[in-house]
Swiss-Prot record:
Pathway: Amino-acid biosynthesis; L-tryptophan biosynthesis; L-tryptophan from chorismate: step 2/5. Binds 2 magnesium ions per monomer. GO terms for biological process: L-tryptophan biosynthetic process. Anthranilate 1 binds at G85, N116. The lineage of its organism: Bacteria, Bacillati, Cyanobacteriota, Cyanophyceae, Synechococcales. Homodimer. GO terms for cellular component: cytosol. The keyword Protease does not apply. The gene is trpD. This is Anthranilate phosphoribosyltransferase. GO terms for molecular function: anthranilate phosphoribosyltransferase activity; magnesium ion binding. The keyword Amino-acid biosynthesis applies. Its EC number is 2.4.2.18. It comes from Prochlorococcus marinus (strain MIT 9211).
Amino acid sequence: MSDFSWPKILDKLLNGNELTSEETNALMNAWLNQELAPVQTGAFLAAFRSKNVSGLELAAMAKVLRDACVFPFPVPDLYLVDTCGTGGDGADTFNISTAVAFLSASLGVKIAKHGNRSASGKVGSADVLEGVGIRLDTPIENVVTALDKTGISFLFAPIWHSSLVNLAPLRKTLGVRTVFNLLGPLVNPFRPSAQVLGVATSELLDPIAQALKYLGLKRAVVVHGAGGLDEASLEGSNQVRFLKDGEISSSEIDITDLGLTPASNNQLKGGDLSKNEAIFMSVLKGNATKPQMEVVALNTALVLWASGLEEDLSQGVEMALNSLKSGNGLKKLLELKEFLGPKN
């Protein structure tokens, strides 16, 4: 099994010790090359869950998966930003980060959104985008062209990461969240320069921020929202890690300092696919409820900071709200459909 010792790796994990980058790399390559039996894969997934994965381990795993993805074209030479969450917050909100992607693109941010269907029976970014007319299995060259022409594109994860598709049956059998739930947001094939990434627990703030640093991102915002949201929330103070020029700083964002109105996370709830589609479209049209509009503006301000287009979060919120009310998010969706719509 290449040059690594499975018993040694498993022993370190079960004892709660951190793997080196080399050990993590060897483990992931053995898995990718189908050198691990299903029981061994299940064992390392369970071990990582019990010991809490480190930023170094996450980055090493992400690099292997990113290098293995299907990508027959050069990575676009643009300052790209991705926006997503790890999921798992149990809040059942509407697709906030997906709406944020289109609003951010309307403000000039180059967005490469990497996403998937929901694994939990809820509504993922891919589900809602397919519902409003984005073709998920569009040819890869169209995805690249769309980014160049419109400033936004959507990368449906299974098209680019066939190895993760093969993992799906085991993850379903295990029935619990694993390290792969954290890796999805870290393996965007376009290798963005910046990212806004929401996490469902505060314990993930530091390892995710460290992983993004090790992956070489220029800027990133990792946020754990008030009330346990994996987005910045209107419910109270949001815990944040800012990554800039290789340095990670901790902060809290009080939404009242940004001129926003406090609101319960219950006011952000989605529902089934049709309800989530309706909320998503009403946000992009600029006629959603105030909490729905303001939570999208808040998270868009974080994207504007990550992109370097606006350092002041309060200014970013104002820019986002003005663009929302003008229906610019919808215009950006319609532009993308020209390249990723059903006719393509």
